[in-house]
Amino acid sequence: HAMKILFPTIRLNHQGMKALIDAAKQNQTNIVRFAALLHDTVDEKIISALCNQYRAPNDYSALALSVNKYYQTALKAKQLSADELLTLFLALDSFRRDERFQDFLQALKCIASDFDGTWLKNCANNLKTLSAIHVKELIQQNYTGIELAHALKKQRLLILNEFLQKN
């Protein structure tokens, strides 16, 4: 009942508590535990308000909001198209914030005990590695601004499609 006293604005259900317990059993970091606990909060405004009220660090808030918004999509990642996967990776900022992406995958393990993040991690790593090469090539071809962004997206989609065909 301590949760009701500490967080009266949040209606925690069985799934959030189960994810928190699983996170503790897996010796996950506090940030992952926090995100797992709040993963199925109905309204992300409640998560933002809670984080503001208790002055949670920005990385806690960002991960909790990302997990809340994208966990269902990520759990069915193998069924997504290349475009949907790219949208997910961009939304999670997985190319620039690898640690947060790894925390996101750990939170998914707590939410869905049968989730194996290896495929999604390999997909993101493959895309990240190959995209870095293509960015340099695109810049050498004098792409800039919006043109560079569109060309990069096109290259990433090609890489993702190749990955999906092989896996």
What is each PLM-predicted segment?
Residues H1-F104, S113:
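Conserved, hydrophobic alpha-helical core segments of structured domains
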Residues F95-N167:
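Charged substrate- and nucleic-acid-binding regions of tRNA-handling and nucleotidyl-transfer enzymes
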